[in-house]
A protein has these predicted regions:
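Active-site-adjacent loops and short helices of periplasmic peptidoglycan-processing enzymes
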Residues: 1-89, 93-102
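Domain-terminus/edge residues, biased toward the C-terminal soluble/receptor-binding domains
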Residues: 69, 80-85, 89-305
Length: 305
């Protein structure tokens, strides 16, 4: 990545990039995550999208995909902007999504890192601003943030006995202590419960036009939800089938989704797959289907000429 003048002269925290310097994308990511380098964040944005503005659009699109629906990003560094905002819940959704990326998980858990420094015989020594990596043994990662407008902000994650939680505090003077208390509360007072198991048949669809007569809906992957210790599990299951679903269906085809929610809030989902083949119940219908497909394919060929 070649560092632009705009990136090199970013205000706020910095890893002291120089205009024209060349540095790897991975080193820049360490600079962003460990040292809160605003210059590194802009260099990444310009490398990926060509401009901060275009990168912010990608940020907003990805945020919505993670479930962060009440955020709007205008820059990659978090510097104040009237139209740049987020919520604690949204930050938790983004962190949960990011932790699934192995590269991100490795970087955010790193305490110290030396990255390249072009033109010098030594590298840049980075120390993670996230003190929880030293204070709280179960910490798996996190990101600090501070501006006068936002105050002290912290997103952090911790894992214990196979369960991982994310805690977020915004404008919080006692961020280190409060996040530790939140993570203790989440790890000690909640448990993970399996709602459906992989391979479970959760419903049968009657299909009179088929030879088999019915189609079993199988769960592709298990779905877990988190509930309070001692609490009862009351969730809503919603089956959403593909609108274009038609015969024939092959065993193993993805035919829809199962969504698990509570009080309108999505807790988890998984694909539904066909548990059996589903074929036409007569030679005539099979022939009609073959002719229809042949006609469609011929039309595509004519349209493409």
């Amino acid at each position: 990545v070649k560092v632009s003048r705009k990136a090199a002269y970013q205000e706020g925290s910095s890893i002291y990039l120089q205009e024209g310097e060349r540095i790897s994308l991975e080193d820049l990511l360490y600079g962003v995550m460990l040292a809160s380098g605003n210059d590194a964040a802009v260099a990444v944005a310009e490398h990926i999208s060509g401009s901060v503005e275009e990168f912010a659009e990608l940020m907003n699109k990805k945020a919505r995909e993670t479930g962060a629906l009440n955020s709007n990003f205008r820059n990659p560094s978090g510097l104040p902007d009237p139209e740049h905002y987020s919520t604690a819940y949204d930050q938790a959704m983004i962190m949960r999504y990011a932790l699934k990326n192995k590269i991100f998980a490795r970087i955010t858990a790193t305490k110290n890192k030396t990255i390249s420094w072009e033109g010098n015989d030594w590298g840049r020594g980075l120390r993670n601003h996230n003190k929880l990596l030293w204070l709280y043994p179960d910490t798996t990662g996190g990101k600090t943030g501070y501006t006068r407008a936002a105050g002290r902000c912290l997103v952090a994650s911790a894992k214990r006995n196979g369960r991982e939680v994310v805690a977020v505090v915004l404008n919080c003077p006692d961020d280190w202590l409060d996040v530790q208390n939140l993570m203790d509360y989440g790890l000690d007072n909640f448990k993970e419960v399996k709602v459906v198991e992989k391979g479970d048949i959760i419903y049968w669809i009657d299909w009179k036009e088929s030879r088999e007569g019915s189609l079993g809906l199988l769960v592709e992957n298990p779905v877990y939800v988190v509930i309070p210790v001692g609490g009862k599990l009351k969730v809503t299951r919603e089956i959403i089938l593909k609108p274009e679903l038609e015969l024939p269906v092959k065993k193993g085809d993805i035919i829809g989704q199962l969504k698990i929610s509570k009080d309108g809030r999505l807790l988890g989902d998984t694909n539904l797959i066909a548990g059996n083949d589903l074929n036409y119940n007569s030679i005539f219908l099979r022939f009609l289907h073959w002719v229809t497909n042949l006609t469609k394919n011929r039309k595509k060929g004519i349209d493409g000429e």
